[in-house]
Amino acid sequence: MLRSLAENFCTPAEVLTKLNHLLVEDFPSGRFVTMVYAVLDPGKGTLTYASAGHLPPLLVDSSGARFLETEMGLPLGIRHGSFSEATVELPERFRIALYSDGITEATNPEDEEYGTARLATHVQRPDACPDTLLGDVRSFANGTGLRDDATVIMLCRK
């Protein structure tokens, strides 16, 4: 479904709006999904993205780490609506992390969350990749297990 929409609609906001329309019609009451939809344009050096109730992308460059601003929007499948998008110009070297709340909300035995600060610190490491981040989250959880899905995608240009 997403692939078909991506081929027929131009922007992340349009794709999320159409996908949401389809899911509102099909999802049982109380069901929803969050996501960030992003389009990387290497030729222009930009990332255009829209959020449906999902956490913001994390951009790391030579100046450090920052969470990309955008309207979060409602999760998909709740009610009809539209989404906004933002475009960021990417530096020559960067790393972008897209991640689920299972990463930031993972807890240790003291019930402390992994959080966004630890996420940003880890993603700034030169060796950071999805495997090292997931390993760090599991190590932080110290045997308590993960209560939610822990998903991460990283895009890099070095």
Descriptions of predicted regions:
Residues 3-158:
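Conserved subregion of the PPM/PP2C metallophosphatase catalytic domain
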